[in-house]
Swiss-Prot record:
Zn(2+) 5 binds at C301, C304, C321, C324. This is E3 ubiquitin-protein ligase RNF19A. The chain crosses the membrane at residues 368-388, 424-444. GO terms for molecular function: ubiquitin-protein transferase activity; zinc ion binding. A zinc finger (IBR-type) spans 199-264. Gene3D superfamilies: 1.20.120.1750, 2.20.25.20, Zinc/RING finger domain, C3HC4 (zinc finger). The keyword Glycosyltransferase does not apply. Zn(2+) 2 binds at C150, H152, C176, C179.
Amino acid sequence: MQEQEISFIFKYNEGLCMNIDSDSILMSILDMSLHQQMGSDRDLQSSTSSVSLPSVKKAPKQRRISIGSLFRRKKDSKRKSRELNGGVDGIASIESIHSEMCADKNSIFSTNTSSDNGLTSISKQIGDFIECPLCLLRHSKDRFPDIMTCHHRSCVDCLRQYLRIEISESRVNISCPECTERFNPHDIRLILSDDVLMEKYEEFMLRRWLVADPDCRWCPAPDCGYAVIAFGCASCPKLTCGREGCGTEFCYHCKQIWHPNQTCDAARQERAQSLRLRTIRSSSISYSQESGAAADDIKPCPRCAAYIIKMNDGSCNHMTCAVCGCEFCWLCMKEISDLHYLSPSGCTFWGKKPWSRKKKILWQLGTLVGAPVGIALIAGIAIPAMIIGIPVYVGRKIHNRYEGKDVSKHKRNLAIAGGVTLSVIVSPVVAAVTVGIGVPIMLAYVYGVVPISLCRSGGCGVSAGNGKGVRIEFDDENDINVGGTNAAIDTTSVAEARHNPSIGEGSVGGLTGSLSASGSHMDRIGTIRDNLSETASTMALAGASITGSLSGSAMVNCFNRLEVQADVQKERCSLSGESGTVSLGTVSDNASTKAMAGSILNSYIPLDREGNSMEVQVDIESKPFKFRHNSGSSSVDDSGATRGHTGGASSGLPEGKSSATKWSKEATGGKKSKSGKLRKKGNMKINETREDMDAQLLEQQSTNSSEFEAPSLSDSMPSVADSHSSHFSEFSCSDLESMRTSCSHGSSDCHARFTAVNTLPEVENDRLENSPHQCSSALLSKAASCSDVPQPSHAADEHGTSRSGGKPMVDLCFGDALRETNNNHSHQTADLKVAVQTEI
């Protein structure tokens, strides 16, 4: 019976636990207490008390018959009543336990329902929060403003920060962060709640709209955002700002300050020059590679002129202006289309600089030559590909269409076969039409559009050569130093040189002499140098006349163009200068010294020509305005003849020093030189008078060693024609009649009017180390040939009076020879005063 009780209790507890699964832990505790209580009841009650247990369940009473009950005797009534009373007590105790357990069950159910209500309330509260797609935080629904144009939602803090960034960077076409729909201005105002930002937003919107208007002109005055919409003002371009207190007058065409009696191009060049000059002075006259690179990082928009910053790292060059939406190329700064980088314009989609002119020309020539081959290859591949590919494509499409449908196999195969057969018939026609139309279009593009567009934009480099025919320029415009990035520029004389920007129209006075022209410098500024013997005269011209003038052209090389051409013509000795007057002022002592040294150095270069002479032409394109120095100078007119006397000293020169100018020969295009006969005579007389000249040199040295100082140069250089025609006459020795020299050894006051400037020691050492014997022999031969025909000459001094001398004139080469042969003497030899004989 005890086993039955335990089994019943476990069954009861098991049923209770099945009803209360959520509180299994609590029910296990109740089971333990129930087992303890039932154990105590069994100890107190009889063994028959457990018979009444089925009555608790209200089940029908059942009798069990066993073998023991048949042989056992019946119980008396007293004992039976006592047993019944004990059974009633057991039933009452079990009912009390059941009631307690039911009460505990109800309490547990009540706690479960309360917890479920709490969870549902919490879940309802969690359901009211939305995650922001920008900051990934959960906010309440009231933190997500509604947008008129799209259904996307973001928190108000993220949207406000997003709008602030967009407006501060002038991006007024603000779209949704998650799609391309633009915000409504009303939504922007509600989200921002900032009057200052909204005012800036409206200003940017208005400016964006006005920029699109072709007749809108903005006032160029600083801190004036007034715009004038001028219709039909092209004929009367003077506009006036209508803002109160401004009244600035500006031009309709160039959109800059009004420039009366001046074209827009001239005014633009003048503004650019003044801007560069201010930049040079403000930056302590220093142009470095970093400053040039920084200037390349900031460029204005070609439509609205809004400045845009881009790192010059070779990234994408297809730019879009944030203010006006203009699409332009960062390299050429022009509005472009999608085909800009596919055409041979020189601009690349990635890169730091466009193609050079040489590369563009080579690409153009390669395209013109290789276009037929390429087009033939494309047509040869396209025709069989279309004939074979079209039927295959049609068959696959029909098969995929009928696949998966309830169509008979025979019907599907019939449709595929019919489609393929039809495509086989049609594909040759399609291929022929495509090739027949595409090939002429490609040929027309290659041979028509590309060359015309390149030549129209100046990219092909073909131009007229000033009556010399068509010329193809292969010099690279990109190699010209912009901003001082490639050239070695001395920073001590840039500002002074800016006052003399034009070589062709003005003078080169006031130059400081710290800049010189070498072969590498001439290559950098685009000088055309010949590989033959014309190089000597080109270098002589560069050394003598262009020395010191690169300080002006190096800073404005974007607008100035220097071309030196050397042409050889038969039986003509002339020097034509189309560049007007070239003069060197009194400030440039060093420049004059270097120029003269360059002329002396280049004079020893032999030329193997018989009866040929050089014509050097200098073409200089510069600005239309000019400055002239006050110092006296020698000049060359357009016809190549000199118009003034040389040797005029400046008023600010110190007295007491002597100098001599170089002798020269006048060369005109209308006279023919008798170089053959005279040269033979001169060569015959050289050998006869060599010993006499040695004696004269020794006598001249002893006479002048204690009287004169070192050979010197005048402060005002001779003209280009005077100096270089002397070189050509020295080379050929053709026209002896035109060489007229004089010698004046008078009083010392004659020499006191000139300033002595020592020549460069580098030139002397170079001559002595390399070829001392050849130089001395050449000088002696020149002296013999020149002094063999003594003629009275006239010298023009600084007062305009002429002086004559009976002694033969000793050239500057005699002074050089004296210096070379007498290096060990304590005093240097002096150079005689040499005047320039000119005809007016």
